[in-house]
Amino acid sequence: MTVERTFSIIKPNAVKKNAIGAIYARFESAGFKIIAAKMLHLTREQAEGFYAEHKGRPFFDGLVEFMTSGPIVVQVLEGENAVQRHRDLMGATNPDNALAGTLRADYADSFTENAVHGSDAVESANREIAYFFTEDEICPR
């Protein structure tokens, strides 16, 4: 297997629930190394830029509103087959379809307020990591 990096967001609803530590424990229990992390409150411009590929879709404005509604935690996770393993840990985008024991089954409130984001491919992970982190902020270990 190949060691990969993936990008992850703990979204405002999970931060508000004080679930950061529990989610980090799940990352580490699943074998991920957290090699970069920061908490921030997205501006509208940052959220629109990050989700630019969804502009024009019916859910875009609501997504931007939600993602700017409170602080988020962004992190870079490293591990074998990290992109797919992180997606498996997150569970289905719609929490109603998420398997028990996944992050979305445990922490999501709705399809939009689904607790976490994760990259869908290595290429998008690289782009998303670069959106929030400089190389100097990433600490391989």
Curated annotation (Swiss-Prot):
One of its GO terms (cellular component) is cytoplasm. One of its GO terms (molecular function) is metal ion binding. GO terms for biological process: CTP biosynthetic process; GTP biosynthetic process; UTP biosynthetic process. Its cofactor is Mg(2+). CDD domains: NDPk_I (cd04413). Pfam families: NDK. Its main location: cytoplasm. It catalyses: a 2'-deoxyribonucleoside 5'-diphosphate + ATP = a 2'-deoxyribonucleoside 5'-triphosphate + ADP; a ribonucleoside 5'-diphosphate + ATP = a ribonucleoside 5'-triphosphate + ADP. Its EC number is 2.7.4.6. It is found in: Cytoplasm. InterPro entries: NDK-like_dom, NDK-like_dom_sf, Nucleoside_diP_kinase, Nucleoside_diP_kinase_AS. Gene3D superfamilies: Nucleoside diphosphate kinase-like domain. The keyword Cytoplasm applies. ATP binds at K11, F59, R87, T93, R104, N114. Keywords: ATP-binding, Cytoplasm, Kinase, Magnesium, Metal-binding, Nucleotide metabolism, Nucleotide-binding, Phosphoprotein, Transferase. SUPFAM superfamilies: Nucleoside diphosphate kinase, NDK (SSF54919). The keyword Kinase applies. It is an enzyme of class 2 (transferase). The active site is at H117. Belongs to the NDK family. Homotetramer. Major role in the synthesis of nucleoside triphosphates other than ATP. The ATP gamma phosphate is transferred to the NDP beta phosphate via a ping-pong mechanism, using a phosphorylated active-site intermediate. This is Nucleoside diphosphate kinase. The gene is ndk.
